[in-house]
């Protein structure tokens, strides 16, 4: 869990879902992206099944160049802070980033023709102890 950040009225953030004390925001806010990168590191580096090379143990961040081009869906609880996230990369942003992140992991040749009409969603995670489905459902609803 991260420090609670009040995103109401924060530049570069837009609330998409307001569910009481839990909000889903779409953001490019550096402070929120930093909190997202810390959550991703905590989830991806600490849990079994992920690569040992995910994130930077020195900074305790899971970050790459795509973060600078993407928009980020962030689940923020008024009490617990950032509890979930997903990274969104629309076609113009993918072009600016040098391509889809997925293309570094998979051969996307077969779906190249639809690339201009899709948004890549990746780096999605929810904090341990909060994986009861509500946060994931709200991220998808946004």
Regions found by a protein language model. Give the residues of each.
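A broad, low-specificity signal marking well-ordered, structured residues that form hydrophobic/aromatic
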Residues: 22, 86, 119
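Acyl-donor binding region in acyl/amide transferases
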Residues: 91-142
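Conserved GNAT-family N-acetyltransferase fold
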Residues: 73, 86, 124
